[in-house]
């Protein structure tokens, strides 16, 4: 079987595809292997899905190549845009179902998935649908007897590997620009969270995409992901995930056909609060900056720096605010923070909490498992940290942050940049000059002022340093999926002789 019946409080019973999506069909894996998908709230098995191996990757790539070399290559930009817009419409129509499935295997709050993730995914698809017929070349005049034009062409077959923290959102971030520019896709989901991607594949069928244009597989990174990054017939690989895996993908891409690479990787982002900031607003955004999505965000504001004049007041207020975050059942109406995605992530985060204690940092609040079932962790704040501590330098990827004090603007710029990462940062201040000076000085791809995590599909997102290569979202993301061709036509007589 390539589907099962599932049920959630918001949807009732529904049909959940479990097969690999290749050539517009849900199919079994060649080797017939499956693996279990776990509900992080209950630690129970939701269902089993097909497990792709190298053989399945080959089949999916062949389907994508056939589609790229076939009618899809001749599809008009207008029609590509219409397909993406139709898909966006279907996302909105099926928002409850997509959000419920996200809550089921990812553990994020249903309310958050419905009100944030799904609308943002639909918005992203619609945005790139609008770009499809606006990708233009140009004519360059070099001489009277020469006609030169520059074309923007699709790269070809694109491999895309997405993470488990924002399954449907990352699906859209990857699919949107690739399809708008005329490519075909083989996308691998994270093994922890495959279900919403397969719901989206049903919508691909309904929207009318031709076979082979979008192929989605589930499998493990060491097998299916490795096969994709080393595949000789994949022209480009895009990956969102850890810096460690990003390095491996770069090596595989270089060692195979030197495929083009886009990487959106880890972060350890500074969230800076100056003494002149609106305290209530700053506390709201600092709380949202770290605890949104259970701290499972690459851009999470996990290093909080507060100017010393307001440090004591801020930390007391922030502790009180963090303790108010409702942690629990993703399907409960008031839940803000659900469980971590897996036992592995739960153990990893608890390990960092223990490391913080051993290194001499002080737990201001949290630090414990919440309940005895599910991968729930209390919102946790560490103080009395030093810049060389692991909890200050390494990405924890959970509801854990550190808070430190600083004296001057120059001091906080220096320590804010004291990281191998450079994905995001924030500055909270009522002084526009301070905001601009600090934002310009921070080595980060995105800097928010008096807010946090306010991403938008129109704005480029990506990192400096070890936080990645290339940019997602905005017009900038289109560059990841196009090649530039120069055509030069000689006019008139022979140039020499």
Swiss-Prot record:
It holds the Pfam family Aldedh. PROSITE patterns: ALDEHYDE_DEHYDR_CYS, ALDEHYDE_DEHYDR_GLU. Keywords: Allergen, Cytoplasm, NAD, Oxidoreductase. One of its GO terms (molecular function) is aldehyde dehydrogenase (NAD+) activity. The record marks 148 as: Transition state stabilizer. One of its GO terms (cellular component) is cytoplasm. NAD(+) binds at residues 241-246. The keyword Cytoplasm applies. It catalyses: an aldehyde + NAD(+) + H2O = a carboxylate + NADH + 2 H(+). The keyword Cytoplasm applies. GO terms for biological process: ethanol catabolic process. The active site is at residues 264, 298. Its EC number is 1.2.1.3. Pathway: Alcohol metabolism; ethanol degradation; acetate from ethanol: step 2/2. It is found in: Cytoplasm. Belongs to the aldehyde dehydrogenase family. This is Aldehyde dehydrogenase. The gene is ALTA10.
């Amino acid at each position: 079987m390539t589907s099962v019946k599932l049920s959630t409080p918001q949807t009732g019973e529904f049909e959940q595809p479990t097969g690999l999506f290749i050539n517009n069909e849900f199919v079994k894996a060649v080797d017939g292997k499956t693996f279990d998908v776990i509900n992080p709230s209950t630690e129970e098995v939701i269902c089993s899905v097909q497990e792709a191996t190298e053989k399945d990757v080959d089949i999916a790539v062949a389907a994508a190549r056939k589609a790229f070399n076939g009618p899809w290559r001749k599809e008009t930009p207008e029609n590509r845009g219409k397909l993406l817009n139709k898909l966006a419409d279907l996302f909105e129509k099926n928002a409850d179902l997509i959000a419920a499935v996200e809550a089921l295997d990812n553990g994020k709050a249903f309310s958050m998935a419905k009100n944030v993730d799904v609308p943002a995914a639909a918005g992203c698809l619609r945005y790139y649908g609008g770009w499809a017929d606006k990708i233009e070349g140009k004519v360059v005049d070099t001489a009277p007897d020469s006609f030169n034009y520059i074309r923007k062409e699709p790269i070809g077959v694109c491999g895309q590997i997405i993470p488990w923290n924002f399954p449907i959102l990352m699906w859209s971030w990857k699919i949107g620009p690739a399809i708008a520019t005329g490519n075909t896709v083989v996308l691998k989901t994270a093994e922890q969270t495959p279900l919403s991607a397969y719901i989206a594949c049903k919508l691909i069928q309904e929207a009318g995409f031709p076979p082979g244009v979008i192929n989605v597989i589930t499998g493990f990174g060491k097998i299916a992901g490795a096969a994709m990054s080393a595949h000789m017939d994949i022209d480009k690989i895009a990956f969102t995930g850890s810096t460690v895996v990003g390095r491996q993908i770069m090596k595989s891409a270089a060692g195979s056909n030197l495929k083009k690479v886009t990487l959106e990787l880890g972060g350890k982002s500074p969230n800076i609060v100056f003494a002149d900031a609106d305290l209530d607003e700053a506390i709201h955004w600092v709380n949202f900056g770290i605890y949104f999505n259970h701290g499972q965000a690459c851009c999470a504001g996990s290093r909080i720096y507060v100017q010393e004049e307001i440090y004591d007041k801020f930390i007391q207020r922030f502790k009180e605010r963090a303790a108010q975050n409702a942690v629990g059942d993703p399907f409960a109406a008031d839940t803000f923070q659900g469980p971590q995605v897996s036992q592995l992530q739960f153990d990893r985060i608890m390990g960092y909490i223990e490391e913080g204690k051993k290194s001499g940092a002080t737990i201001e609040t949290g630090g414990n498992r919440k309940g005895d079932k599910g991968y729930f962790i209390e919102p946790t704040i560490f103080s009395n940290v030093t810049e060389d501590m692991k909890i200050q330098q390494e990405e924890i990827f959970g509801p854990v942050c550190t808070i430190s004090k600083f004296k001057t603007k120059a001091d906080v710029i220096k320590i804010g940049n004291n990281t191998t990462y450079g994905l995001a940062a924030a500055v909270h201040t009522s002084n526009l000059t301070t905001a601009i000076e600090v934002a310009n000085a921070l080595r980060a791809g995105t800097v928010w002022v008096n807010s946090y995590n306010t991403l938008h599909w129109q704005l480029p997102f990506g990192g400096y340093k070890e936080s990645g290569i290339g940019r997602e979202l905005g017009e900038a993301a289109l560059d990841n999926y196009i090649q530039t061709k120069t055509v030069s036509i000689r006019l008139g007589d022979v140039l020499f002789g």
